[in-house]
Amino acid sequence: MAGWWPALSRAARRHPWPTNVLLYGSLVSAGDALQQRLQGREANWRQTRRVATLVVTFHANFNYVWLRLLERALPGRAPHALLAKLLCDQVVGAPIAVSAFYVGMSILQGKDDIFLDLKQKFWNTYLSGLMYWPFVQLTNFSLVPVQWRTAYAGVCGFLWATFICFSQQSGDGTFKSAFTILYTKGTSATEGYPKK
């Protein structure tokens, strides 16, 4: 068991693209499985396969290329470079990733209007992401070596995937809807929130 970390480190150095893509895909897919479990539903492996397909074919590859592009365009860890990377990531990268998720999942689910979820949930999800991803990426850009950035984003993406997969299935793209389902899981829908 102790030999897995050196083997993973070697794989990331020798084959950074597939190692990062597979790690990212595995972690985000696990996030989908977790959100199903948190809702008390039976495992829907078909849904998790859809998430895995989308993440491995687009998101993990996009993140791998995007993070390296940001590093080339804005090299270093100086405060101005970090701020510029964060700004570019949130203004350009985040909208692409959120849009691709909602449209991609709608395509894989065979929905008639593949843009409906995007229209209904984009802004809420994007604004929710602004409360999470800048902190993740600040750590990523300032502390994580380039060859591990996609994998690190995948680790943090596990939590994000739990949220965004829930939003795509049941929520409205806000953190409030995700927390509400956790709260109401133990109470009936008629009981509502505790009175103050």
Curated annotation (Swiss-Prot):
Region (Targeting to peroxisomes): 16-55
Residues exposed to the Lumenal side: 35-50, 109-150
Top-level taxon: Eukaryota
Segment forming the signal sequence: none
GO BP of this protein: mitochondrial ribosome assembly; negative regulation of hydrogen peroxide biosynthetic process; negative regulation of mitochondrial outer membrane permeabilization involved in apoptotic signaling pathway; reactive oxygen species metabolic process
Key words of the record: Membrane, Peroxisome, Transmembrane, Transmembrane helix
Tissue spec. comment: Isoform 1 is detected in the kidney (at protein level). Isoform 1 and isoform 2 are expressed in the kidney, heart, liver, lung, pancreas and skeletal muscle.
Claim: Transmembrane helix is one of the keywords in the record: yes
Entry's transmembrane regions: 17-34, 51-67, 91-108, 151-167
Family according to the record: Belongs to the peroxisomal membrane protein PXMP2/4 family.
The protein's name in its UniProt record: Mpv17-like protein
Source organism of the structure: Homo sapiens (Human)
Gene transcribed to yield this protein: MPV17L
